[in-house]
Amino acid sequence: MNRNYYSSIILLFSVLFLKQADDKEFKPLFNGKDLGGWYSFLKSKGKSNDPDTIFSVKDGLLKITGKEFGYIVTERSFTNFHLVAEFKWGEKKYPPRESRVRDNGICYYVVSTDKVWPRSVECQIQEGDCGDFWLIDSVTAVVDSIQQGPTKNTRVIKKKDNERPTGEWNRIEIIANQGKCTHIVNGVVVNEAEDVSLRTGRILIQSEGAETYYRKIEIKEL
């Protein structure tokens, strides 16, 4: 009995140790204080020119007003990774999308020069559509053994809906590894693609007409 007891204790501590070690492999892309490691790009104003504070940080949250189309993008590139981001919608919407569903997005494998929108793979963040793929600017992939693209922009609709109601926090995960990309919404796999034609690049978060908040953006390189 004592032997079983001690074996259980050792097993418990081993599991906890491995979990802590795994958690520590994730590193923050957003530090909760400022936009260090990122720069902004706005369609009307260009790079690192944000006089109307479309992007700001307060109380540990990244606020994106959505008032202008653009994005913040990492200064460095990533190849194989597991990205975790937590977001929720704000209340405000702006032209030309003031009467449409709220829209945002996380693009990865960004390889082209700055523009709206650069060549990349997008994990759609939009009311009712979180987890859709957008293959932007002739990117290709294989989904369910069917070639997707190349066209200007190709949408691949998610297979499951697992979003929380507007105003609540949602957890988005993107796993990109050796040409296979997986989108996870609140712990459920909603979309997968293989043979993605991009394999490395930067990561961006869009501003696209809707007020959006992020409280966590972290990454583990694989």
What kind of region is each of these model predictions?
Residues 19-222:
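Carbohydrate-interacting regions of secretory-pathway proteins
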